[in-house]
């Protein structure tokens, strides 16, 4: 068995490292894109299983390397919660990103508009794909998935746009959601 002194010492060290990581400077990070997402995880608190919402920010450096910048438990994905996370990143020296990838949560989009108005925003293709399938009958999932993948992996922006129009035309006729 592990003694409570060992647990206390270990917790103090982990807490100290966690606090240092959460307050580290981001001024020298060559971050050009951000991926922002809220996720729900199941945890045990006071011997009871419960769900908590985590706000996660991943930075993408100029060389394509991904860096975890923030993971915060804020009680949900409200505009205020996301604004607090974004303000903290800016306070730590994060420069204005060139591009944002988001999950589509309304609170996040409002917080972004308040902090980085004008930065291009793209809906995460994984979230969009899940949303499409959630609104379609299961018998169409494979075909919709194949068409969607074909569209998002097109080689040029012109090809993407042509495939997007084709996707919309086909699926508006085949399945009105």
Model-derived features with residue positions:
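DNA-recognition alpha helix
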Residues: 1
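RNase H-like nuclease fold core
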Residues: 4-101, 106, 110, 114-118
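Extended amphipathic alpha-helical interaction segments
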Residues: 110, 114-177
């Amino acid at each position: 068995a592990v003694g409570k002194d060992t647990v206390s010492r270990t917790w103090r060290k982990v807490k100290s490292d966690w606090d240092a990581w959460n307050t580290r400077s981001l001024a020298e990070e060559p971050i050009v894109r951000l991926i922002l997402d809220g996720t729900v995880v199941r945890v045990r608190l006071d011997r009871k299983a419960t769900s908590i919402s985590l706000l996660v920010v991943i930075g993408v450096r100029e060389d394509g390397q991904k860096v975890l910048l923030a993971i915060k438990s804020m009680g949900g994905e409200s505009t205020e919660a996301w604004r607090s996370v974004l303000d903290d990143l800016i306070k730590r020296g994060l420069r204005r990103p060139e591009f944002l990838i988001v999950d589509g949560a309304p609170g996040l989009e409002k917080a972004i508009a308040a902090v980085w108005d004008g930065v291009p925003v793209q809906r995460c293709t994984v979230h969009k794909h899940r949303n499409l399938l959630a609104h379609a009958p299961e018998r169409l999932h494979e075909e919709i998935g194949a068409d969607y993948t074909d569209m998002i992996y097109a080689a040029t922006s012109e090809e993407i746009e042509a495939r997007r129009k084709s996707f919309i035309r086909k699926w508006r006729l085949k399945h009105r959601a």
